[in-house]
Amino acid sequence: MRIRRRALVFATMSAVLCTAGFMPSAGEAAADNGAGEETKSYAETYRLTADDVANINALNESAPAASSAGPSFRAPDSDDRVTPPAEPLDRMPDPYRPSYGRAETVVNNYIRKWQQVYSHRDGRKQQMTEEQREWLSYGCVGVTWVNSGQYPTNRLAFASFDEDRFKNELKNGRPRSGETRAEFEGRVAKESFDEEKGFQRAREVASVMNRALENAHDESAYLDNLKKELANGNDALRNEDARSPFYSALRNTPSFKERNGGNHDPSRMKAVIYSKHFWSGQDRSSSADKRKYGDPDAFRPAPGTGLVDMSRDRNIPRSPTSPGEGFVNFDYGWFGAQTEADADKTVWTHGNHYHAPNGSLGAMHVYESKFRNWSEGYSDFDRGAYVITFIPKSWNTAPDKVKQGWP
């Protein structure tokens, strides 16, 4: 998208990420997406308030606790989140609204589509439960939560980073007019990531894992199959330590252990994918510049494997670069297990923010975006990871093909 098109696209797009913030003055939150195009903060684009930012970030930070505390958990203080009401199982969804490569709808209508298309367990449609609707009410992370069956742990994340490009740019490039050295280094690091290659790497690994799951009826058989598949493909992951999250991911998946899920039988599971966008400068002990403009060394994938160590991801948002700014801490998109080979034709499901129909944010909307729409960044984020998790094959939350909107 070139600069001359940006205003038109931003003016017509709905709030498509689980993000919000204060409306800064012109240029305050502007960044560059690596193609010579200016990207703005989500706050500037969608005119959400500083209070919205604080509420969204607080709720996002409380979500992991909610995932273990159960549906009765409520975030403290200003949590105006509301669980969407139940929808009749046989009620058909209304058409989604198309908008520049994505389809948009309200959360209640998404529940109707989910029940018709994604709810099936062993071929039978299910009504979305109160607990699932509670998960969904958290916004972008809620969409991934309800489809994966667990709050996302992000342990098995992949990305692609061009080390040579990064070094060459630092050596031969120079800051732009008005750009500090810290801004320059953060921008070059961000531009050295390739989201499409990171996504493709996650797809490659998920494919290997799915082959290893076939005909493996215990974890030992699965791990043996996995190591053979990696060796046959000369994949660098074959050298991962036995304690690596790569090898423990399946056993740490709750649905793998559930009687109505995997029941400890790997052949009943399949590897699926979701994505997380977030900020690199999360280390509170690092310099203020890194917290504002990004930490070039943080969350880089391991050479060869593409694995990203997410253990230091604390859902901490970008620090303001000027008074009054606010940035949101993350965004999630659900991919599942689509077989479409062309990344640009894949569909990513995500939400704008938590469901607050009686608050200033308003009702949650759900979006089905093509990959280019999903991966196109905002200045709130400088990292995009593509994460593998597992769901039972008996679930239909990750079908081979996803059709945008309804019908």
From Swiss-Prot:
Residues 32-76 form a propeptide. It comes from the Bacteria. Its EC number is 2.3.2.13. Residues 76-94, 286-298 have a biased composition (Basic and acidic residues). SUPFAM superfamilies: Cysteine proteinases (SSF54001). InterPro entries: Papain-like_cys_pep_sf, Transglut_prok, Transglut_prok_sf. Keywords: Acyltransferase, Signal, Transferase, Zymogen. Residues 62-98, 282-322 are annotated as: Disordered. It is an enzyme of class 2 (transferase). Catalyzes the cross-linking of proteins and the conjugation of polyamines to proteins. This is Protein-glutamine gamma-glutamyltransferase.
